[in-house]
Amino acid sequence: DHIFNEWQEGCIVVDPAGKLVVLIRIDDSRTNDLAALVSVTDQRTITFNPATGFCDMPGGGKKFTVRYDTVSGKYWTLANPCYDKDRVRTHTGWYSTRIYPIFLRSRLVLCSSADLRNWTVVKEVISSNNCFFHGFQYTDWEFDGNDIIAVSRTAFPESRGLPIRQHDANMLTFHRIVDFRSAGFTTENITYDQL
């Protein structure tokens, strides 16, 4: 019942049972908040069960990194979810009828899961109302004590103007997410009037 454009950019992780799995982003043209959990049997064998292998994951359609935290006993990720309020927005040209979910990257959220299948949005890290020209994407990160340090491929206005679109990054940005386990950080809200 799913419509896929592609599966790509998997993240290898050890599941709660101690087995190696690949959590793969899925470009599902309808929702874009879906990922696939593929089991690694050995060096030459992976398996996927369509009845149980899909998981609802905020931002599962865009590249993400998942890491396990021994302190909280949870898996964590930074992702770009697809909010309904953004899905219906329009702009000139490419986005004259709507913005496709694969391009919604203006909100970066911290998510957690105890089992890699059930994901919860903990808190927004960055939230911009400009889904056409702002993008905080392809984020890679590490734990740093009680914080997360992250690098984002970012599309954002600068002295030469706007980036071509949110996917076409014009800078790399560094972020520190303070006290991530307790969501002790402040969301960076960006309101951009020149849409």
Where are the model-predicted features located?
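Beta-propeller and closely related beta-sheet repeat lectin domains
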Residues: 8-11, 62-65, 137-140
